[in-house]
Amino acid sequence: QFNGETYHLFSKQFCQEMSKSLDERIWKPELSIIEGEEVIPMRDTELYLKRRKKRFMRDIRLCLRRIAYASSVDLDTHLQWQRWMTRTRAMDEHLKDLFSNGISTPDGGKFGGKGFRSTWQEGVVGCATSLNRAIDLPPENRHQADIIAPMIRDVGLALAVGQTPLEIFAAQMGKSGSYMDGGNLDSGGRDLHIGNWEKGVLPPTAPLPIASATATGVALAAKLLRINRFHLAPVGEGCSSNGEFWEAMNLAGARGLPIAFMIQNNQIALDTFTVGQSGAETFGDKGHAMGIPSWTIDGSDPLQFHASTAASREYALDGGGPTLIHVETMRGCGHAHHHDDLYLGSVTGNPPGYVGRELLSYWAEKDPLPNHRDYCLSIGANEKQLISMEEEEQAIVDAARKKMEEMPWPEGNTVTKGVTSRHDAETHTEQFERFEKEGGEILSGPLKDGDLAIEFSNASNSSTYGRAIQNAMVALAERHGDDIVFMGEDMEVAGAFGMNSSLKAKGHSGKLLDMPLSESIIINSATGAALGGMRPVAEIQFGGFAALAMNALVNNAAQLRWRWGADVPLTIRIPLGAKTRSGPFHANMIESWFVNDPGLTIVFPSNPQDAYDLLIESHELNDPV
């Protein structure tokens, strides 16, 4: 039997002895024949084995820390998990009922909401007791709170870190008072997902990897700003097939960011079985390719969620970097409410459901609510205590549903409010009125084709585009100090076209950040860094490469203010056009791709003075430009 102190001493001694034993094995006579041999270029036997040993010992230490955290949990913590899981299951039952029966709308119809449930996956609430929750901190310190980026099914985790049942109901039913109001009173219902940024819950998105990629950027901001903050990014196994998720893990591994990724293997992603998603033995194996320690846990046990999150948090905040937690689980319902009949089978037997009964039976027996309830009883809880808690939670959720139903529906004309900090979007009516006023003709510019309003100089000391942009970037670096970062490909040596030489000459090398060659993670992580307290300047090296960041630009950065009123102070520089002399894929004229997106501000300078002014002014906006 160990206590905390004796277990710590045992763990320390165990690791020392194991490390010593591994060192001794390297020099056994049977290995002497490969001593000094080059295993791979520039890596001999000794160096190769030392690195392998270092990673192995890291995994052993993390395993011992998980055991330590699991062993330190008391009855009160188990009862808290049971309460949160009970609340989640009660929410699930209401959400299914709402979807099936709907509630009345002003036009005389019915609406049933979005509908994602957590059945059999409520154990994820265990993560919350390992986190520094925003709701437990004074308002002035909430920027230091840990951040979660839940998947759509993690209702229990959102509730456990502080979202209320009313928030979840209002979001999934699209009521005017929901959090998804673009920061405008009574303008909710724009997005039917969970989330509350002020409580440390990054709202998920339908393009699944956006949330984890954005959370990676928030983690990047924490590291650059030296904020002691941890980040947790759960996804499903289907999302783990997406390139943007891999790019997020790759950046986190390369930069040692304080984040834990969590792949929840639901067994079936919508209707695609795991054999169609990955050839790896486990989804945890995906971490090793990124240099990230990973392990597998049972998703029906909140204790394993708690211990794994606690160990990951400790490792990350001690400077170890990211981890990957693989969760074996199964959802006891369809992908969404509408999917239940196809997935499980209709009550009428038609359709019969395609999921094997044996698979369903196995996971039904692992249902965390009754199993963990029995465990609570076995360690000292009493039946009356649990019944009282269950009645309380049911009453809380019932009351929240009633209050949600009393909330007004949003007015349709509120949907145009706040697409950027500067303006609202036009309605179709307003667009048609403008077309009629303009007579349907293309407006003429102030100059005829080929005319110039500015006389360009050939003098050796005249300003150029490049010089103007360099001067503007130096001015921004000096104005914003530690809050600014210039991020993109090949930034730290000189940057494309040597544009970063002035920043380096002025002593701002520390503000330059080389990114992996992935336009998507450049923009997604820059968006996250903007949410995390920075004012990034992101660079896409050539115009055509912006296509690789389309999802990040239009489905992420452009929509955050409109969805929930977020400030996203992000400036993106993209050189394009014939002057780059770079041909196809590089010089593409891309303005038409983005100018019709209401959440993006597009500026296109035509001379050096405008290049300077627009870069300075753009960066003062709290919007993506």
Regions found by a protein language model. Give the residues of each.
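Short acidic, glycine/serine/threonine-rich loops at helix termini
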Residues: 127-129, 159-164, 243-247, 271-276, ...
